[in-house]
From Swiss-Prot:
InterPro entries: Mur-like_cat_sf, Mur_ligase_C, Mur_ligase_C_dom_sf, Mur_ligase_cen, MurD. GO terms for cellular component: cytoplasm. Keywords: ATP-binding, Cell cycle, Cell division, Cell shape, Cell wall biogenesis/degradation, Cytoplasm, Ligase, Nucleotide-binding, Peptidoglycan synthesis. Gene3D superfamilies: Mur ligase, C-terminal domain, Mur-like, catalytic domain, NAD(P)-binding Rossmann-like Domain. This is UDP-N-acetylmuramoylalanine--D-glutamate ligase. The gene is murD. Its EC number is 6.3.2.9. It comes from Mycolicibacterium smegmatis (strain ATCC 700084 / mc(2)155) (Mycobacterium smegmatis). It is found in: Cytoplasm. ATP binds at G126, T127, N128, G129, K130, T131, T132. It comes from the Bacteria. The lineage of its organism: Bacteria, Bacillati, Actinomycetota, Actinomycetes, Mycobacteriales. Pathway: Cell wall biogenesis; peptidoglycan biosynthesis. PANTHER family: UDP-N-ACETYLMURAMOYLALANINE--D-GLUTAMATE LIGASE. GO terms for biological process: cell division; cell wall organization; peptidoglycan biosynthetic process; regulation of cell shape. It catalyses: UDP-N-acetyl-alpha-D-muramoyl-L-alanine + D-glutamate + ATP = UDP-N-acetyl-alpha-D-muramoyl-L-alanyl-D-glutamate + ADP + phosphate + H(+).
Length: 493
């Protein structure tokens, strides 16, 4: 595609711009557009949100009216949650109206010098590990004395931080954001891994991988070589420098692990960066996240000592393999952010013997391969949420000896207290506990912790790594994790 870096052609004074989405991103877009003297109008299907913004003087329009007048707009700037199939975006595409995401707008404004000298963008994406890796990267940059701002899918939108003094942006981007950012050319970008996720949004695994690969079109492209899909993106990357990382001994042009140390053979000839034992995220996934972050930091010249110091002091974020308590010799860990099978598998493999708390909304993903890979680590499973039966079926097929407790709650349960029954499929026996009472989230997690304690022995780990989204029973993965932690605290007394 032609180089459109810094091209703001549709944003001439007086041009009509439609902004879709009334949330944090949409408001950030309006703020960025205001100095450009364009006529911005906000569209959302949430009538209450539109009314609240209209009361503050924001020009708003209902989706139906926006579709009817779509040809009057010079540009649509969309929030990343809107899929290409969304009616207003489909209408814009059919009418030939350009569609940018908020990241595309931020990239072009920054490249055009609207906020001073353009920053160098270091972009992290992947199905799993994005937030931890981006946080590690930011800490490495700061430890190296660089002015860095953490932004994107973590914290503030990129548009909201461009007025801050910074040399570098540590940016976490989702596949949704990347889909709508075709001109992005970061200083360095990493694809950590690519597994089935959001296929309902992207339409296919190939389309999902293509959107992830957009971070590889800048100067330095980095991929996780232990992930076959991510590794397959490197040969076709447009970047002038291509780097891989792996858990094993690195070849030339790679980062990896040798004798328990992180080793850089891409930007140096075998220099040690850190001791794996100092990484504050358990298991191989923590090492992989550290390698991905280190590759981007090394791409902009951060010294090995700064990388080691940052990793030694790094603390994992909330709901990401977070230890929330110990009861009778059993450690309880909140990894509620493990919202797909790939993330759950990585989480479980960090521990020897696990009582697995799983379920929620699987979004069409299969858990069969996950269960096959971790069956020998499972001491038991406690299943929650709308798609719990899919997990139960996979356990019956691939881990028939693992005891299972299935919790039925919310709309699926008509009881006010707690009922219990036994179900069997062949030789596989499942305890079914019906949980009543309100709020549902508290009742569910209280029952989860009680059931998990029955299944666990001293030395085991009770791991909330659901492999599914949370919105069937919780407001988000954060509330799910908070409810789990509160139930553990109550059990401790």
């Amino acid at each position: 595609m032609p180089d459109v870096t810094g091209d703001l052609a549709p944003l001439t004074p007086g041009a009509r711009v439609l902004v879709t989405g009334a949330g944090i991103t949409g408001r950030a877009v309006l703020g960025a557009l205001a100095p450009l003297e364009v006529a911005a109008t906000l569209c959302d299907d949430n009538a209450d949100a539109l009314a609240a913004l209209a009361a503050k003087g924001v020009a708003v329009i209902a989706p139906g009216d926006a579709i009817a007048s779509i040809g009057d707009y010079a540009l649509v700037v969309t929030s990343p949650g809107f899929a290409p199939s969304a009616p207003v975006l489909a209408a814009a595409a059919a009418a030939g109206v350009p569609i940018w995401g908020d990241v595309e707008l931020a990239w072009r404004l920054d490249a055009a010098g609207r906020y001073g000298p353009p920053r160098r963008w270091l972009v992290v994406t992947g199905t799993n590990g994005k937030t931890t890796t981006t946080s590690m990267l930011h800490d490495m940059l700061v430890a190296g004395g660089r002015r860095s701002v953490l932004c994107g899918n973590i914290g503030d939108p990129v548009l909201a931080v461009l007025d801050q003094p910074a040399e570098l942006l540590a940016v976490e981007l989702s596949s949704f954001q990347l889909h709508w950012a075709p001109s992005l050319r970061p200083e360095a970008g990493v694809v950590l891994n690519v597994a089935e996720d959001h296929l309902d949004w992207h339409g296919s695994m190939a389309a999902y991988a293509r959107d992830k690969a957009r971070v590889l079109d800048g100067r330095v492209a980095v991929v996780g070589l232990d992930d076959p899909v991510a590794a397959g993106l490197l040969p076709t990357a447009a970047a002038t420098v291509r780097v891989g990382f792996r858990l094993g001994d690195p070849a030339a042009g790679e980062l990896g692990v040798r004798d328990g140390k992180l080793i850089d053979r891409a930007f140096d000839d075998g220099v040690e960066l850190a001791d794996c034992a100092d990484i504050g995220v358990a298991g191989p996934i923590g090492v992989l996240d550290a390698l991905g972050a280190a590759a981007l930091a090394r791409a902009v010249g951060v010294a090995p000592g700064a990388i080691g110091a940052a990793l030694a002091s790094f603390q994992v974020g909330r709901h990401r393999a977070e230890v929330v308590g110990t009861v009778d010799g059993v450690v309880f860990i909140d990894d509620s952010k493990a919202t797909n099978p790939h993330a759950a598998q990585a989480s479980i493999t960090a521990y020897d013997r696990v009582v697995w708390v799983a379920g929620g909304l699987l979004k069409g993903a299969s858990v069969d391969e996950l269960v096959r890979q971790v069956a020998n680590r499972l001491a038991g499973a406690v299943l929650i949420g709308r798609d719990r039966q899919m997990v139960a079926d996979a356990l019956s097929r691939h881990a028939p000896d693992v005891p299972v407790v299935e919790l039925v709650a919310g709309e699926d349960s008509g009881v006010l207290g707690t009922n219990e029954s036994i179900e069997s499929v062949g030789d596989h026996v499942t305890r079914v506990i019906e949980v009543g009472g309100r709020p549902v989230s508290d009742a569910v997690m209280s029952a989860v912790v009680s059931a998990a304690r029955d299944l666990a022995s001293p030395g085991d780990t009770v791991l909330l790594a659901p492999a599914g989204a949370s919105f069937d029973q919780f407001s988000g993965y954060g509330q799910r994790g908070d409810a789990f932690a509160a139930a553990v605290r109550a059990a401790v007394g």
